[in-house]
């Protein structure tokens, strides 16, 4: 693997939209007992369900630690799922894996962002995180992809959504947080995004979903569904703490044009719940200094927006909630050429995220 001294934009590469053709999806096998209850066993079962759902549409590669490799391999024993051994600190490959970029000549490379476990020692979710910091480079090594490294710049893949046509959406709550890149101004952060995603327009939403422990990742709140169109988590309940967040985001989107000069079409997605972990679920998580404490009184940041687009499919979470059926109908309407597959998302949510957070698509090479 070669680490390049240039940037994707300078070399003619860009991050494609999630609906672009993919060669595979990456996942990481969960096991961390201070994040996943009961030693991670319920979460592992949920990951098997997720991997098999994706594998109906395209290949899946699941990275597992040495101690869990055989267990993962046996549980994921089907032809379209590959299991490889990569040491890791947790399963959030959207944030720890590389952001793949492509050009028009059939090449795929990767951006290796800095990672500090969502805040380092200022509100981060666990320590140490050195194995997660190394994961992107190992994935790129495995795929023989050349690497761009943003030395000294922290970013998680869940904090950005692109349309592949020059626009990225993010949140101020995350990217301007003092625990990510406090040494950089908003303008300097935008410059890094422009250079490494090859975008021209950065759309800043004020906040993400209430109580999102990643500091408001956009992939749990607002996502692109096609160029010029987004899906926004929404509530009409003025007593819901998400109400002000949703309306503030809508104000930005309604008064912003994208890189192509288009006004945004905004589709609304209901927010499930409110959802909470039970005392029993919280008691199953090991208590370790420096790790995120699980508390049944704290609302979970459940969201149907946290879905993954794959080749011909939409893999979305369900929560055994009255809004599940409406969420499915909305996704089916927005993606008429995709099959909507909903899988139980509660166990993933208990760990702090959901389907999009736990997956990373690898785009297919494009030759023009």
Swiss-Prot record:
GO MF annotation: an example: protein-arginine deiminase activity
Protein name, UniProt field: Agmatine deiminase
EC category name: hydrolase
Hydrolase found in the keyword field: yes
GO biological process, one term: putrescine biosynthetic process from arginine
Entry EC number(s): 3.5.3.12
InterPro entries noted in UniProt: Agmatine_deiminase, Peptidyl-Arg-deiminase_porph
Active site: 357
Description of how the protein assembles with itself and partners: Homodimer.
The encoding gene: aguA
UniProt record similarity statement: Belongs to the agmatine deiminase family.
Keywords: Hydrolase, Polyamine biosynthesis
Organism name: Pseudomonas putida (strain ATCC 700007 / DSM 6899 / JCM 31910 / BCRC 17059 / LMG 24140 / F1)
Pathway: Amine and polyamine biosynthesis; putrescine biosynthesis via agmatine pathway; N-carbamoylputrescine from agmatine: step 1/1
The keyword DNA damage is assigned to this record: no
Superkingdom as given in the UniProt entry: Bacteria
């Amino acid at each position: 693997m070669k680490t390049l001294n240039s940037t994707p934009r300078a070399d003619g590469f860009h991050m494609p939209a999630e609906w672009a053709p993919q060669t595979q999806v990456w996942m990481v096998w969960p096991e961390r007992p201070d994040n996943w209850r009961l030693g991670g066993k319920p979460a592992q079962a949920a990951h098997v369900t997720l991997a098999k759902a994706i594998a109906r549409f395209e290949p899946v590669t699941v990275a597992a630690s040495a101690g869990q490799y055989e267990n993962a391999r046996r549980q994921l024993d089907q032809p379209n799922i590959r299991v490889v051994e990569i040491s890791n600190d947790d399963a959030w490959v959207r944030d720890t894996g590389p952001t793949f970029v492509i050009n028009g000549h059939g090449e795929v490379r990767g951006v290796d962002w800095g990672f500090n476990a969502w805040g380092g020692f200022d509100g981060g979710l666990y320590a140490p995180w050195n194995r997660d910091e190394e994961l992107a480079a190992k994935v790129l090594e495995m795929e023989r992809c050349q690497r761009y490294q943003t030395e000294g710049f922290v970013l998680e893949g869940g904090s950005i959504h692109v349309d592949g046509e020059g626009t990225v959406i993010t949140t101020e709550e995350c990217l301007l947080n003092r625990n990510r890149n406090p040494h950089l101004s908003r303008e300097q952060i935008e410059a890094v995004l422009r250079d490494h995603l090859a975008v021209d327009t950065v759309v800043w939403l004020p906040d993400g979903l209430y109580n999102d422990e990643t500091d408001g990742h956009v992939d749990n709140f607002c996502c692109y569904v096609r160029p010029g169109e987004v899906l926004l988590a929404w509530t009409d309940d003025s007593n819901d703490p998400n109400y002000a967040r949703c309306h503030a985001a809508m104000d930005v989107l309604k008064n912003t044009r994208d890189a192509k000069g288009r006004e945004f079409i905004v589709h609304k997605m209901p927010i499930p719940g409110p959802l909470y972990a039970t005392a029993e679920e919280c008691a199953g998580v090991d208590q370790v200094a420096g790790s995120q404490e699980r508390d049944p009184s704290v609302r979970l940041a459940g969201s149907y927006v946290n879905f993954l687009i794959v080749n011909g499919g939409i893999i979305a979470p369900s929560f055994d909630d009255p809004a599940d059926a409406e969420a499915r109908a909305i996704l089916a309407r927005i993606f008429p050429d995709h099959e909507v597959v909903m899988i139980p998302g509660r166990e993933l949510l208990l760990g702090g995220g959901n389907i999009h957070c736990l997956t990373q698509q690898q785009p297919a090479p494009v030759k023009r």
